[in-house]
Amino acid sequence: MKHLLRNLWIAALIVCCNFQQAFAQQMPPIPIDKNVRIGKLDNGLTYYIRKNNLPANRADFYIAQKVGSINENDDQRGLAHLLEHLAFNGTDHFKGNSLQDYLQSIGVEYGRNLNAYTSVEKTVYYFTDVPTTRPTAVDSCMLILKDWSNGISLTKEAINDERDVVHNEYRMRIVGQQRMIERSLPKLYQGE
């Protein structure tokens, strides 16, 4: 009887998930804001620019790359995440920590409004709430985005340092997930 109930529960869950997926596919596309200027560069980069006066004299900068863990082979696990970390350790135009130092000098704080993340299908770098009152700030921020797309410094020292950081992040994440799984298993398989 317990097996029958569990199998019925799983079947109901599958039906609900498939219904939700079918419904999601029927949704109309999200309309594009007419105030967004969209273009594509010769190198394939698609850009979106939208003027926003609130807050005044501030800008947000993002670069989303269609590269994530899905692009890795089994022997490359974590490479996309490692590259994300290396982007903050030096680029063609910002050596060492000078990228973070420059952004801090114009009012951008690492962690609060300067960060990045890697997911399965993409890597996104961003810095937000950037004061644009300094005449060269926007140009310098665009140069940072350019460097993040094609100018990350890949020195042996930086790679070795960040490899340890990425491994520790992974271990911390796995330990937390493992604890959640271990707590859930007795409830999922109660009485078996």
Where are these regions (language model features)?
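Bacterial Sec-dependent N-terminal signal peptides
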Residues: M1-Q25
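N-terminal hydrophobic alpha-helix used for membrane targeting or insertion
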Residues: N7-I10, P31, I70
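Intrinsically disordered, low-complexity segments enriched in polar/charged residues with Gly/Pro
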Residues: Q25-M27, I49-R50, D101-L103
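Mature N-terminal segment immediately following signal peptide/propeptide cleavage
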Residues: P29-I63
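Active-site-adjacent, His/Asp/Glu-enriched structural segments that form or flank metal-binding
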Residues: P55-N57, Q65-Q190
